[in-house]
Amino acid sequence: MKITQIDEKSVKQAKNLISRVLSTTVENPNNPESLNFFQADTYRFYFLMSFMWEFLAENEISQEYAISLVPKKFASRIKRLQVLKQAVQLGFIIERSSDVGRRRRIYAPSEILLDDFVNYAHSTSQFDQDKAS
């Protein structure tokens, strides 16, 4: 397919999508440290989106559940565990013992990550509104 075969409206929509994604992620100089961490590679970004989806759906997120959120084709089990543990060490994700079993770990976003993510969602929505004006 050649670009000349794509209608003008579709080209404009595609360019708007690219602009929105880049300006609210990797090209955003004001990105907080937490979002930069999760936007460093595809796996981390996929993990962030899946993790926040589950959290916002009020699902309990155990270690096994957290590392199963992203398909295996994106990262090995070791990489998935490393990213989770690194996010905990950096203070982006909070780890606590389960009320049911002491050995079971439960995860939730820290206040920092939650605030950064909500602001990120707001800026993405704001970008869409600005483009519509």
Where are these regions (language model features)?
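Short, Lys/Arg-rich nucleic-acid/phosphate-binding segment
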Residues: 97-106
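Short, amphipathic alpha-helical interaction segments positioned at domain boundaries
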Residues: 111-133
